[in-house]
Regions:
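Conserved PLP-enzyme active-site core in the AAT-like
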Residues: 1-210
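Conserved PLP-binding active-site segment of the aspartate aminotransferase-like
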Residues: 213
Length: 213
């Protein structure tokens, strides 16, 4: 977009973290908001592939990327595979804020955004993995444009500290060793327990919000 002499345009779900808004202000890219219908709820609802397809088809200016938060702050997990298919059919990249979903890669069947077709996503490892606060992973799909890797390194150099916390780095390495061990088996067991608890709560008449594993 910059090479064409225009500001990049990102279509973003309105329930994004405020840091996305700060990034738009700092990097001077334009944003068009994607707001799902409330469907009688006061809570945020998921962006569906049908809604995204309609929004992209009706857009006066095609965005360069779509930005989705999944899981969201209420535990809703979007249909990333469906959203990725829609984005790529329209010639648009898909970026996912997977801050609360670092563990999704280690379920019996991976639900991680990269495995489901996203072009780029970030995991806040410290939120759902045994990592010190501030530890995170940036994932770039092998199917993403070739310049992504180089641009990511440049951006990290621009915004990252030259004095990183080696405590955080070591905690990421320790977590990687944990993930390579029996973590997937323990996660599968916990997911089964969580599902059973949801069913029991629903049976007692509680409205259980979110479909996160």
């Amino acid at each position: 977009a910059r090479a064409e002499g225009r500001s990049p345009l990102v279509m973003a779900a309105r329930n994004c973290h405020r840091t996305f808004v700060f990034a738009a202000a700092m990097l001077d890219f334009d944003v068009c908001w994607l707001c799902p219908p409330a469907k009688g709820s006061y809570l945020a609802c998921k962006i569906t592939p049908a809604l995204l397809d309609s929004a992209l088809g009706a857009a006066e200016k095609k965005p360069d990327a779509v930005y989705i938060t999944s899981p969201d702050y209420l535990g809703n997990v979007a249909d990333i595979a469906g959203l990725a298919e829609v984005c790529h059919r329209h010639g648009v990249l898909l970026a996912v804020d997977n801050a609360h979903g670092a563990y999704l890669r280690f379920l019996p069947v991976s639900r991680h955004p990269i495995d489901l077709g996203a072009d780029i996503c970030c995991d806040s490892a410290h939120k759902t993995l045994p990592v010190l606060t501030g530890g995170a992973y940036l994932h770039i799909s092998n199917n993403a444009p070739a310049l992504f890797a180089a641009e990511a390194r440049r951006a990290l150099a621009l915004f990252g500290s030259t004095s990183p916390s080696y405590l955080i780095l070591e905690s990421l390495d320790a977590a990687n060793r944990e993930l390579a061990g029996d973590f997937p088996a323990r996660l599968a067991d916990m997911a089964e327990r969580t599902s059973a608890l949801r069913q029991r709560l629903s049976a007692y008449g509680f409205a259980v919000i979110g479909d996160e594993p």
